[in-house]
Design a protein with these regions (language model features):
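Structural preference for beta-strand elements that scaffold enzyme active sites
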Residues: 41, 68-74, 112-116, 153-155, ...
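Secondary-structure boundary elements
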Residues: 67-68, 106-114, 142-155, 174-180, ...
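Active-site-proximal beta-alpha loop/turn segments in soluble metabolic enzymes
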Residues: 82-87, 119-131, 154-160, 184-190
């Protein structure tokens, strides 16, 4: 199928949540409102202890509340998610996962959210057996076909700029061969803007698609490829905006929720749980 062409006229109208899910913390630490006042990704996925429920109604309610603005919806529930690591979980079988994708699609309908599709799912293929990786690619292709039925803008995650080589990304996108709106760089990671742009621009020219960068925690860059789990002394990055320094980059977004743990390293709680000390550190280190 023919992909959508590069669009230079894209305008994002991001949704700023009008509720404070961390009210108990912001009362004690008002500086946290720097984080809670921004348009941040809403993650939908299943875990071993928290299966997905009422997905269609939850997605629809979010989109209706946000309208005419665009919420950021992160789909994160592919089978064998995170290959059994800190964020392990996802759906147990492909059939239930595709049902989950159909429910999200139905919940979105004619609304136009920004959809971040499956952080790390494609990069992890490089760590899978051939048959398992091929099966995952087939599942991703089917999922993207379903998501075409809604009006959301779909961006497929391609990991951080030190994971896949640009030609690997091109092979994956060519194989999937579905009309997506772009790809995502640096989801839940810490790499600085210069590194992200160098990699993203190269990929963009190869695949003829624009990209987004997760800047939620990359204000002072990364400590290295192996230090991605709650590294100390990091900082919030550029606040969400469409004013980027690359013609190929549509926006800087906060896809990862700043202050949510990467896993149980460096003093952090389980992945996805609020990590107050990290949140305060991210704020304190801005501009250093």
């Amino acid at each position: 199928m023919e992909r959508r062409r590069l669009r230079k006229d894209i305008r994002l109208n991001l949704y700023y949540p009008d509720w404070d899910s961390r009210a108990n913390h912001t009362e004690l630490y008002p500086q946290l409102r720097v984080i809670t006042s921004q348009p941040i990704g809403h993650w939908f996925g299943s875990s071993p202890t928290k299966p997905t429920k009422r997905v269609k109604s939850r997605v629809h309610r979010l989109c209706r509340r946000a309208h005419p603005h665009q919420p950021i919806i992160v789909i994160y529930s592919i089978p064998n998610r995170d290959l059994g690591h800190y964020s392990r979980g996802g759906h147990k079988e492909e059939k239930s996962y595709l049902k989950f994708i159909r429910e999200i699609t139905a919940g979105i309908g004619d609304y136009n959210p920004i959809i971040i599709f499956e952080p790390d799912a494609i990069p992890h293929i490089s760590n899978m057996k051939f048959e398992d990786g091929f099966r995952r690619l087939q599942l991703i292709k089917k999922s993207l076909q379903i998501l075409q039925r809604c009006n959301g803008r779909v961006y497929v995650d391609m990991g951080n700029p030190k994971w896949l080589k640009p030609n690997q990304v091109k092979r994956y996108i060519d194989w999937i061969n579905e009309p997506i709106d772009g790809f995502v760089v640096n989801t839940s990671n810490y790499w600085d803007l210069k590194t992200c742009h160098q990699w993203g621009d190269k990929v963009s020219r190869m695949v003829n698609l624009h990209y987004l960068i997760d800047t939620s925690r990359n204000g002072v860059g990364s400590l290295g490829t192996d230090d991605w789990c709650n590294p100390p002394n990091r900082a919030l990055g550029v606040f969400p905006t469409t004013r980027t320094s690359s013609e190929y980059c549509e926006a800087y977004l906060w896809i990862k929720v700043p202050g949510e743990s990467d896993g149980t390293l460096n003093g952090g709680p389980k992945a996805g749980r609020f990590f107050l000390e990290q949140a305060l550190s991210l704020i304190e280190n801005v501009g250093r």
